Amino acid sequence: MKKLEERILRDGNVLGENILKVDSFLTHQVDFTLMKEIGQVFADIFHESGITKVVTIEASGIAPAVYTAEALGVPMIFAKKAKNITMTEGILTAEVYSFTKQVTSTVSIAGKFLSPSDKVLVIDDFLANGQAAKGLVEIIRQAGASVEAIGIVIEKSFQSGRKLLEDDGQRVVSLARIEKFENGKVVFGKADA
């Protein structure tokens, strides 16, 4: 997605050898116009897949996921990272390691929101090592639902996430694919859309 790549080049900051900070439009402050366009691109790609739910993980995946769900006309569910006292029964969980935060969290979704008849599109802000998406796939499978595809806003292709997910049989579609960081700059590879 050319507009997304242009925004990354303009407003993204490379930190070290493998971190991209995009807090001005995605991970802290949200550019809803851009998120709406991202949601529409994902909806255009997956509109014939029979998607019944969009699933993401809190927090930065919520904005692109909600606009994708809106464009598809389906509900959006986000996995919670913190234990919630109101979620008391039928909880589906998975362990997820965060590359950026360097911590493992137990993420959860109330089982009543997913059923075996659901065809799920996973949406996330970043793909690095693939652990967040893998955890969501695990939760969706616990519900007996099917994962139709995984939509990623920004993929760091030099990390192992895509391989991990594709080796598990998942279709991965990334709107921006970063091949490498070179001299503090982003070098893009060919995106999927």
From Swiss-Prot:
This is Xanthine phosphoribosyltransferase. It catalyses: XMP + diphosphate = xanthine + 5-phospho-alpha-D-ribose 1-diphosphate. Disulfide bonds: none annotated. Belongs to the purine/pyrimidine phosphoribosyltransferase family. Xpt subfamily. Converts the preformed base xanthine, a product of nucleic acid breakdown, to xanthosine 5'-monophosphate (XMP), so it can be reused for RNA or DNA synthesis. CDD domains: PRTases_typeI (cd06223). Keywords: Cytoplasm, Glycosyltransferase, Purine salvage, Transferase. The gene is xpt. Homodimer. NCBIfam families: PRK09219.1 (NF006671), XPRTase (TIGR01744). One of its GO terms (cellular component) is cytoplasm. Xanthine binds at residues 20, 27, 156.
